[in-house]
Amino acid sequence: TLARQYDGTTAAAGSTLSSFDALQGGETLTLSGSGTAANDNVANGISVSSLGTLALVNGTGAASNYSLNSTVINIAKRVLNSSGSKTYDANTNALAGAITLSNLVSGEALNHSGTATISSANAGSYTISNLSGISIADGSGGAASNYTLTGGTHNFTVNRRPVGVSGTRLYDATTNAVASDLSTHANLVGSETLNLSGTGTIASKDVGSNKTVSVGTLALADGTNGGLAANYTLTGGTHQLTVNQRPLNATLARQYDGTTAAAGSTLS
């Protein structure tokens, strides 16, 4: 009896020997060469319809004392691996659309659907803890009955969610974009909040709208409603600062001249 995983072929190699059924006195033999199975799909007890080059090889017993009679092969389901990723979204779902199957036979594809589960919603790398929600179906050249997800390696990564910061301040003759001026945080999940510290920079100190902020020493910190800085990143976010004109009060001074004139030249 030979045994192997499904590989899309009818190969029945001696190297896949599982057992002999009539060896005497505890003797052992091995098997070399290769024959041809009657079909290539998953099943037990498939007849090796052509012995081909299969041959008995001496073990603790002499091959010359035995002859190779009927031979069968058990073809087991091929174990699939999977991997995937998503951006942090505060849940433990790993949707089929974010998962890629691997270890398929070359030229075969499968469809898959449903939702798996990971052990934590937070950003990080995980082994998928529950695959029961994922099902596989026939695809291009691939039959689902020849494959299984059970026993494979299934990894999933939750990436940090990019967050953007924006705000306004009055002109102050600097290119600083301090955290306290960047009070709007975009792309947070649900009601989660974050805190911000440090100072970024803008390219010009002058008045203008939606100036791009370089991150500099700006840093995220844990906020409220479950907002954890470790689940977010400033990298990839859109960061903008609007610099508004600073209101000025002017004081003029002159001697009485009998008029209501308030000339700029009398600025004090």
Label each PLM-derived region with a short phrase:
Residues 1-268:
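Short loop/turn motifs that initiate or flank beta-strands
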